[in-house]
UniProtKB/Swiss-Prot annotation:
Binding site for NAD(+): 78-91, 285-297
Short name of any one Pfam family annotated for the protein: Iso_dh
Amino acids binding substrate: R99, R109, R138, D227
Function description: Catalyzes the oxidation of 3-carboxy-2-hydroxy-4-methylpentanoate (3-isopropylmalate) to 3-carboxy-4-methyl-2-oxopentanoate. The product decarboxylates to 4-methyl-2 oxopentanoate.
Subunit structure and binding partners: Homodimer.
Organism: Buchnera aphidicola subsp. Schizaphis graminum (strain Sg)
Amino-acid positions noted as binding Mg(2+) in the UniProt annotation, renumbered to this chain: D227, D251, D255
Molecular function in Gene Ontology: 3-isopropylmalate dehydrogenase activity; magnesium ion binding; NAD binding
Protein name: 3-isopropylmalate dehydrogenase
Catalyzed chemical reaction(s): (2R,3S)-3-isopropylmalate + NAD(+) = 4-methyl-2-oxopentanoate + CO2 + NADH
Cofactors: Mg(2+); Mn(2+)
Residue spans crossing the bilayer: none
Length: 363
């Protein structure tokens, strides 16, 4: 590892600053116990940046991210800023420009249901009795969200609107390579999601994915149409390892996978570019309704930090130790409100303390 690893810390809005404080506890242990040399610099983003500087992504924040090796992101948004035009609101005016600026073409969303938390899943107990571990890999910078032309118009027949789904072969190839590489260190299965029976873009998607798969003979490739995939995830989620998806399909199916785990407060995410520069954030939102109550689940933020350690710093053993510390905390029965019975639960800061203690003690 380089002499000093620079992390831009962007707590943001809502519960973002609260759960980020718990991630700092882990970062302190990484410096003290594992001798990592970290340079942590905090910047405003989202609603708080609008309040202070009039813009969701200030130039100072963008420059700070450019001078960093990775971004640890909290959350942005809230009703307070709903009066703004959509394009100026925290979510639209901060995250999307960051993804575009750093060419973060891949989004990794783990959806893991631990056996000791299977009661949280809305699925039948016989379906989730062994838990599941799915990694959704979503192409993030192409497809219908960014394709042109798009627009909304009126003519003599009425009002109409249109969007364009477009993918280049190189966009599909690079996301497919990432999926197969990651599958090689997991259970060696990739299921590619498309709609190749009706969409030309999906026909190309399937062709390129098949082509890339030839370079990974040890990884089993399968294909599902998006509608069937959504059904199969409900019917038997344990059959899946990695789901490889286009932008819009990944947007939909990763939320479905998150929901069947029972708590989005447990789920991290990573958005990466070709240089493994990444933006790491909880999969959930800013949850302004519980802001300041010390009841938010910090696990997604801590696991997002673990993903940063794994993918941008390439320190898998240390990332494994963080993941194990979370595992031990849950195994011992510690629960925040969102994953509790509603009566017996601990506070945000207490969960952070417990996970940090397990990491520090090296259990």
């Amino acid at each position: 590892m380089k002499k000093k690893f620079r992390i831009a810390v962007l707590p943001g809005d809502g519960i973002g600053p609260e759960v980020m404080r718990e991630a700092y506890k882990i970062l302190n242990i990484l410096e003290r116990k594992f001798f990592l040399k970290l340079e942590l610099r905090e910047f405003d983003i989202g609603g708080i940046a609008i309040d202070r500087e009039g813009i969701a992504l200030p130039e100072k924040t963008l420059r700070g991210c450019e001078n960093s090796d990775a971004i640890l992101f909290g959350s942005v948004g809230g009703k307070k800023w709903d009066y703004l035009p959509i394009e100026s609101r925290p979510e639209r005016a901060s995250l999307l420009p960051l993804r575009k600026h750093f060419n973060l073409f891949s989004n990794l969303r783990p959806a893991k249901l631990r056996v000791d938390l299977k009661n949280l899943s809305p699925l039948r107990s016989d379906i989730v009795r062994d838990g599941f571990d799915i990694l959704c890999i979503r192409e993030l910078t192409g497809g219908i969200y960014f394709g042109k032309p798009k627009g909304r118009f009126k003519n003599k027949n009425g009002e109409y609107a249109f969007d364009t789904e477009i993918y280049y072969d190189f966009e599909i190839e690079r996301i497919a390579n990432l999926a197969f590489e990651l599958a090689s260190s997991r259970r060696c299965k990739v299921c590619s999601i498309d709609k190749a029976n009706v969409l030309e873009s999906s026909v190309l998607w399937r062709e390129i994915v098949k082509k890339v798969s030839k370079n990974y003979p040890d990884v089993h490739l399968s294909h599902l149409y998006i509608d069937n995939a959504c059904m199969q995830i409900i019917k038997n989620p344990t059959q899946f390892d990695i789901l490889l998806c286009s932008n819009i399909f990944g947007d939909i199916i990763s939320d479905e996978c998150a929901m069947i785990t029972g708590s989005i407060g447990m789920l991290p995410s990573a958005s990466l570019n070709n240089q493994k520069f990444g933006l790491y954030e909880p999969a959930g939102g800013s949850a302004p309704d519980i802001e300041g109550k010390n009841i938010a689940n910090p696990i997604a933020q801590i696991l997002s930090l673990s993903m940063l350690i794994r993918y941008s710093m390439n320190l898998n053993e240390i990332a494994d130790k963080i993941d194990l510390s979370v595992h031990y905390a849950l195994k011992e029965g510690y629960r925040t409100l969102d994953i509790s019975d509603g009566k017996n639960y601990i506070k945000t800061n207490e969960m952070g303390d417990i996970i940090a203690e397990f990491l520090d003690n090296g259990k």
